[in-house]
A protein has these predicted regions:
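Short, hinge-like loop/turn segments at secondary-structure boundaries
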Residues: 89-93, 154, 233-236, 320-321
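Short FAD-binding loop at a beta-strand-to-alpha-helix junction that anchors the flavin cofactor
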Residues: 297-323
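Cysteine-cluster motifs in flexible loop/terminal segments that predominantly coordinate metals
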Residues: 1-44
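Terminal amphipathic helices with adjacent charged low-complexity linkers/tails
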Residues: 42, 81, 88, 134-141
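A Rossmann-like FAD-binding core segment of flavoenzymes
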Residues: 98-145, 153, 158-161, 169-190, ...
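A short, charged/proline- and glycine-enriched loop
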Residues: 42-48, 188-190
Length: 323
């Protein structure tokens, strides 16, 4: 509807975060820089390939098209939006309205002249075949999944694995309905070790605890919450304390076996934590391979959003990079 054409805030508190200077908006990358980042018409029209249909790629494709370029957006899966719907499910029932992001970007793509090609994996041969003037790579970087003993056990879950498992249910039921259904059944064990206490790990710990799971959250350093805006981040650990979530700092998982997860502390010592399942929630890490491949056949190439890894994988930077 008409509301989807408006960049509605999601109550994420990014624009209020004193840590982020200059201030930025998660869904409005032009906040405070409206003149500098206005989509001005280009002097020379180009044919542009945008690789990756997540928030950064969708924002980039729309902006380039608005400026007058001929844009084709490529996504290797069957749907645009990246992991937005999965994030909306995890945050369902809270204060954030994550689906505003998906609805707005989808509406903008539909209104634009951007050509969308789903289920299309971009390789060097395709780029040479299409012969674009420029390529923008906005595809996800790989998540860090350390090769420890037991990492391939069937009761170990990674972010890419959970994203894939959730694709069909999310399409069938939507984030809110699926979140409600998960309160009655979620296909993991009762006792869970979550490895990684950044934004993904902390929010996963809250989601799972609300579904009656016993949680041990393993932080590789002293920080819990990562790049979650300060307004919400400062509330996380008090909630964990009240809810009975155990936080283990300065530790890593050395092995995962039948008895549970073997933690190894940075100051020395080990602890075996009995558990039924382990979730690996470590952050993305930059892998230049895709960009290097995409850049080789063309004169102009850029990498944005999740391709850069680290902070750029998160929506605020993804939108800004896409702009």
């Amino acid at each position: 509807g008409l509301m989807d054409g408006i960049r509605r805030g999601t109550r994420c508190a990014v624009c209020e975060d004193p840590v982020t200077q200059p201030r930025i908006g998660r869904v409005n990358p032009t906040l405070g820089q409206e003149r500098q980042l206005a989509a001005k018409p280009v002097a020379k029209k180009k044919r542009v390939m945008v690789v990756g249909g997540g928030p950064a790629g969708m924002e980039c494709a729309c902006t380039l098209s608005e400026r007058g370029h001929e844009v084709t957006l490529y996504e290797k899966t069957g749907a645009l939006g990246g992991r937005i719907k999965l994030a909306a499910m995890i945050k369902s029932g809270g204060c954030e309205e994550v689906m505003h992001i998906f609805n707005h970007l989808t509406a903008m793509i539909e209104k634009s002249d951007v050509e969308v090609r789903l289920k299309t994996e971009v390789d060097e041969q395709l780029i040479r075949q299409e012969a674009p003037d420029a390529v923008v790579v906005a595809a996800s970087s790989p998540y860090r999944i350390p090769d420890i003993p037991g990492i391939h056990r069937k009761n170990v879950f990674t972010i890419p694995m959970m994203s894939k498992l959730a694709q069909v249910p999310l399409k069938m039921f939507g984030p809110d309905k699926l979140a409600s259904m998960s309160e009655k059944f979620f296909p993991v064990g009762k006792r869970i070790v979550i490895w990684g206490a950044g934004a993904e790990g902390a929010q996963c710990a809250e989601f799972m605890r609300k579904r009656g799971k016993d949680i041990v959250l393993v932080a590789e350093d002293g920080d819990v919450g990562g790049l979650i805006p300060l307004k919400y981040k400062e509330r996380i650990e008090p909630w964990f304390n009240r809810a009975g979530v155990r936080v283990v700092r300065d530790a890593t998982v050395a092995e995962f076996g039948k008895q549970g997860a073997l933690l190894r502390f940075s100051q020395g010592g080990e602890e075996l934590v009995p558990c039924d399942s382990m979730m690996v929630m470590l952050p993305e890490q930059r892998d230049p391979a895709l960009f290097d491949m995409a850049a080789s056949p063309v004169d102009e190439a850029s990498a944005i959003g999740p391709t850069l890894g680290g902070e750029s994988e998160l929506p605020p930077r993804a939108f800004a990079d896409g702009r």
